[in-house]
């Protein structure tokens, strides 16, 4: 933008600057946003990136009448739809990696809406405006104010095409972005907080800002989020632990790195499975192998075989909203010929949890749901603390990490004999 502003003062220098900037911007765009529109770093980083991107693109279009091919990139055309579906019915996002769940007003959703003539894209922005959740000091989120609102005035420019009544409700119940580095499938029965929302991811840990969370999922229903992803500790806390213990590099994403010693970054504290207490393979790429769009089974299937570090012969997880009524996960795991597979099936939750005869009972407000696992293998249900010292897998950095007494991990353990196949069907239903 500086090159545009000072072009008349020094045309040669500014022209060289613009040529390099346009070329590097296209390369950078493709590095961040996949061909399917997804950002492998998640929604929080996408918002930061896309707002700067839109300022550049808008400046080029205003000055030269063209964005020099940026908007022709397929991923660019799809990325706003990806973000729309990553926001759950509660107004919180599906989080993975270093992201948090807060969601801000995103002025660029109005830009994309006008550019691609899609009045569904700013759905959550319009909802926030109607509910008075637009805050002068920052964004909107059910838990407080987050990012700066310095770009809000751009809404006046980018939203001018539509009247308020022109924005419409998205109609697709299932959305899939399966070609990116962190593939996702999202299913929802509707768009109100009472409706159900499911998201599941694949991917790998050897990526910027990633966690060992392939196979993780998020589930909302009946006005509450039941399966979540806890907010991580501040970088400074973990960096101090790594430095004081002299145990490596926090930003090394390879297998065995100090990064995976952090309590809330390793696979045991995410809504996925671990086998034989082993970490995931940081290079193991879990791909979405099926997307189901039928009302009777909305969701997707992810192959976790490469993720589980050779501990099993194969592992496939299907997550669906069944008959638009309840959540169902089906994990089909084949043990190696020479060893048992001791599986820990877990997820983080802010609900009150107790073990009952039928499984796990989770309560939030006046709503209670029941988690039950059906399998031929013996099931041991459990509740584990969100405390690096008291968890069943204590953290190497526990003296530096935050202890949270009101958050829990819950799930179950299953032991699969060598060479055997075990199918585990887990449901979460309202009681």
Describe each PLM feature range.
Residues 4, 189-191, 202-204, 273, ...:
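Short, flexible loop/turn elements at secondary-structure junctions
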Residues 1-48, 52-61, 140, 155-172:
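Active-site lining segments of carbohydrate-active enzymes
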Residues 31-55, 60-64, 185-191, 195, ...:
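Long, repeat-rich segments with strong aromatic
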Residues 169-263, 359-369, 425-431:
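Beta-strand-rich N-terminal accessory domains
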Residues 19-33, 193-197, 208, 310, ...:
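Active-site-adjacent bridging/hinge elements
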Residues 102-103, 193-195, 206-209, 226-227, ...:
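Flexible loop/turn segments at secondary-structure boundaries
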Residues 240-431:
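CBM-like, beta-strand-rich accessory domains located in the C-terminal region of large
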Residues 48-226, 289-297, 303, 417-419:
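Carbohydrate-active enzyme catalytic cores, enriched for enzymes
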């Amino acid at each position: 933008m500086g090159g545009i502003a000072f072009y008349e003062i020094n045309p040669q220098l500014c022209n060289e600057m613009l040529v390099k900037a346009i070329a590097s911007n296209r390369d950078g765009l493709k590095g961040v946003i996949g061909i399917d529109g997804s950002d492998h770093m998640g929604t929080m980083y996408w918002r930061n990136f896309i707002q700067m991107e839109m300022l550049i693109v808008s400046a080029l279009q205003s000055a030269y009448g063209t964005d020099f091919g940026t908007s022709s990139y397929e991923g660019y055309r799809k990325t706003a739809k990806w973000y729309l579906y990553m926001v759950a019915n509660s107004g919180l996002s599906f989080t993975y990696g270093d992201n948090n769940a807060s969601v801000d007003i995103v002025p660029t959703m109005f830009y994309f809406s006008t550019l691609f003539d899609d009045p569904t894209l700013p759905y959550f922005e319009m909802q926030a405006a109607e509910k008075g959740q637009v805050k002068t000091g920052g964004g909107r989120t059910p838990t407080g104010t987050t990012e700066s609102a310095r770009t809000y005035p751009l809404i006046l420019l980018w939203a001018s095409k539509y009247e308020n009544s022109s924005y419409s409700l998205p109609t697709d119940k299932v959305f899939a972005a399966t070609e990116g580095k962190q593939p996702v499938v999202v299913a929802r029965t509707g768009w109100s907080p009472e409706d159900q929302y499911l998201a599941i991811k694949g991917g790998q840990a050897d990526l910027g800002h990633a966690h060992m969370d392939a196979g993780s999922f998020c589930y909302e229903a009946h006005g509450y989020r039941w399966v979540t992803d806890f907010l991580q500790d501040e970088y400074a806390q973990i960096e101090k632990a790594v430095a004081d213990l002299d145990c490596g590099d926090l930003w090394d994403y390879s297998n065995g790195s100090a990064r995976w010693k952090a309590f809330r970054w390793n696979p045991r504290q995410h809504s996925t499975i671990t086998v034989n207490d082993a970490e995931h393979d940081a290079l193991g790429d879990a791909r979405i192998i099926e997307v189901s769009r039928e009302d009777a089974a909305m969701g997707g299937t992810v192959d976790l075989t490469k993720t589980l570090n050779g501990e099993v012969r194969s592992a496939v997880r299907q997550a669906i909203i069944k008959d638009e009524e309840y959540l169902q996960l089906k994990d089909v795991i084949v043990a190696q010929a020479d060893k048992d597979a001791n599986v820990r099936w877990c997820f983080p939750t802010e609900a009150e949890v107790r073990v009952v005869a039928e499984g796990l009972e989770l309560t939030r407000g006046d709503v209670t749901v029941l988690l039950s696992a059906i399998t031929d293998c013996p099931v041991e249900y459990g509740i584990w603390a969100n405390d690096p010292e008291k968890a069943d897998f204590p953290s190497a950095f526990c003296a530096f990490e935050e202890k949270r007494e009101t958050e829990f991990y819950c799930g179950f353990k299953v032991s699969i004999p060598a060479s055997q196949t075990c199918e585990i069907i887990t449901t979460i239903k309202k009681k």
